Amino acid sequence: MAEKQRQLKLQKIYKQKYIGLGDESTTREQWQRNVRNDTLNTLQGHSASLEYVSLSRGDLSIRDTRIHLLKSMSPGYKAYLREER
């Protein structure tokens, strides 16, 4: 019983610390968006990863790649890209 209470306490702490975990009412789409945003945030936050992404995209500067990753995290950005074409 003590182990179960410990696990519930840890789960509560992790949910407060890592918002992307969600809860019972989190939909699949919300969870996927959280994971995607966490990944993009990690890529733009670590210089080595950012440099790798910049090279793979063919961008001339790391700054352009960082801006693209940050814009990609906003919900309306995909609609903006579709309108641009």
Swiss-Prot record:
Keywords: mRNA processing, mRNA splicing, Nucleus. It is found in: Nucleus. Pfam families: SF3b10 (PF07189). InterPro entries: SF3b5/RDS3-10. The keyword Isomerase does not apply. One of its GO terms (cellular component) is spliceosomal complex. One of its GO terms (biological process) is spliceosomal complex assembly. Involved in pre-mRNA splicing. Required for the SF3b integrity and prespliceosome assembly. Belongs to the SF3b complex composed of CUS1, HSH49, HSH155, RCP1, RDS3 and RSE1. This is RDS3 complex subunit 10. It comes from Saccharomyces cerevisiae (strain ATCC 204508 / S288c). The gene is YSF3.
